[in-house]
């Protein structure tokens, strides 16, 4: 706390930082809680022969936010894995990721770093069909890459380490980057895999479509069942809630500390002001009662004992209010009787 009771710059920065972090965490928590509530409110629809009749009776022949589960089936052609035999799917994602170590000039340590240098995703049209045989119904899945939880399975993964010569090693130390290698990954959504879709379910021209929902709700195509998906969202909500509460408590504690310091500083100023007024009032009463020839000596009297002459100048406040004996009798740490500031130096006052 600075002089005058004003908070210091560090306290302002701490309060501002915790407030901004708390607001950001609370915003994320609200967004996660909204997504969780929307998932809880999604209507579970059974993928069966009565699906079209259910949708035809729904307003606008659609369910705005529905949950449906089925097996993946390609419409026409399928995608073959480039590395695994007899592995067919409807979505294929190939990724090349570079791994390297970068020298940190601040910590003087080598830090692991990775970045995707190439990624390609191939898709073909596919449906969700019932697991049971003999049920003639299918749901066409539209825009699968727009989903926030695309349930791809890693079918191939290989790390290709970098081959380095002695001159390469020296060059890497000079440049501050040491390549470790390239990681090659293939992910696929296999034919026959179980998929849980959460989105807008629409009946259009006797065909059923699952597409991204409107009104800002999230689109899911997950390999997990709906209960596991909901549980994961609720766990995320609890985590962000705890983080928001922790930083909120830190913000409140910082604010309480600053306000308490200001309150104590204000109370101290009021007490010193009251003490000074009492000194002045007491001195005025003595002057009014004294004889004219004694008034000059009273004006120069020590405010503590009122018997000796003032003989000390207190620094840094500059008050002249005490005799030498009363100054010596002040308790440690010595403070000015008028303003209660710490006495750093005393200059003797010589009365003529």
Curated annotation (Swiss-Prot):
Result when mutating residue 305 to S: Failure to reduce TP53 levels and abolishes ligase activity
MF-aspect GO terms: identical protein binding; p53 binding; SUMO transferase activity; ubiquitin protein ligase activity; ubiquitin protein ligase binding; ubiquitin-protein transferase activity; zinc ion binding
Pathway: Protein modification; protein ubiquitination; Protein modification; protein sumoylation
Keywords: Apoptosis, Isopeptide bond, Membrane, Metal-binding, Mitochondrion, Mitochondrion outer membrane, Peroxisome, Transferase, Transmembrane, Transmembrane helix, Ubl conjugation, Ubl conjugation pathway, Zinc, Zinc-finger
One Pfam family linked to the record: zf-C3HC4_3
Domain of life: Eukaryota
Effect of residue 260 to A: Protein is targeted to the ER
Localization per Swiss-Prot or TrEMBL: Mitochondrion outer membrane; Peroxisome
GO cellular component term of the entry, any: mitochondrial outer membrane
Segments on the Mitochondrial intermembrane side according to the record's topology features: 30-238
Subunit details: Homooligomer. Interacts with MAP3K7/TAK1. Interacts with UBC9. Interacts with and sumoylates DNM1L. Interacts with MAVS. Interacts with TP53 (via N-terminus); the interaction leads to ubiquitination and proteasomal degradation of TP53.
Function (record text): Exhibits weak E3 ubiquitin-protein ligase activity. E3 ubiquitin ligases accept ubiquitin from an E2 ubiquitin-conjugating enzyme in the form of a thioester and then directly transfer the ubiquitin to targeted substrates. Can ubiquitinate AKT1 preferentially at 'Lys-284' involving 'Lys-48'-linked polyubiquitination and seems to be involved in regulation of Akt signaling by targeting phosphorylated Akt to proteasomal degradation.
Comment text on domains: The zinc finger domain is required for E3 ligase activity.
Entry protein name: Mitochondrial ubiquitin ligase activator of NFKB 1
Origin species: Homo sapiens (Human)
Taxonomic lineage: Eukaryota, Metazoa, Chordata, Craniata, Vertebrata
């Amino acid at each position: 706390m600075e002089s005058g009771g004003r908070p210091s710059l560090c306290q302002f920065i701490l309060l501002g930082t915790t407030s901004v972090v708390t607001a950001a965490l609370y915003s994320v928590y609200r967004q996660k809680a909204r997504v969780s509530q929307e998932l809880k409110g999604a209507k579970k629809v059974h993928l069966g022969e009565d699906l079209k009749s259910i949708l035809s009776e729904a307003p606008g022949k659609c369910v705005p936010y529905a949950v449906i589960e089925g097996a993946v089936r390609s419409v026409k052609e399928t995608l073959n894995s480039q590395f695994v035999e007899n592995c067919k799917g409807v979505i294929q994602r190939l990724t090349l990721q570079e791994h390297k170590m970068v020298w940190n000039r601040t910590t003087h340590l080598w830090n692991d770093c990775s970045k995707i240098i190439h990624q390609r995703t191939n898709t073909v049209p596919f449906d969700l069909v019932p697991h049971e045989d003999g049920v003639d119904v299918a749901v066409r899945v539209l825009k699968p890459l727009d989903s926030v939880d695309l349930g791809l399975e890693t079918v191939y993964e290989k790390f290709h380490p970098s081959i380095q010569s002695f001159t390469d090693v020296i060059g890497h130390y000079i440049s501050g980057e040491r390549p470790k290698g390239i990681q090659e990954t293939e992910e696929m959504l296999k034919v026959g895999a179980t998929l849980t879709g959460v989105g807008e379910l629409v009946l259009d021209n006797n065909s059923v479509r699952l597409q991204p929902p409107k009104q800002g709700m999230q689109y899911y195509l997950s390999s997990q069942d709906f209960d596991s998906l909901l549980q994961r969202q609720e766990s995320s909500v609890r985590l962000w809630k705890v983080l928001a509460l922790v930083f909120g408590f830190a913000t409140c504690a910082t604010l309480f500390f600053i306000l308490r310091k200001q309150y104590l500083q204000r109370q101290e100023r009021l007490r010193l002001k009251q003490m000074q007024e009492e000194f002045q009032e007491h001195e005025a009463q003595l002057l009014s009662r004294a004889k004219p020839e004694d008034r000059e000596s009273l004006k120069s009297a020590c405010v503590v004992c009122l018997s000796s002459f003032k003989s000390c100048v207190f620094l840094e406040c500059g008050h002249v209010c005490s005799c030498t004996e009363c100054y010596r009798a002040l308790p440690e740490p010595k403070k000015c009787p008028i303003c209660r500031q710490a006495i750093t130096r005393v200059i003797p006052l010589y009365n003529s």
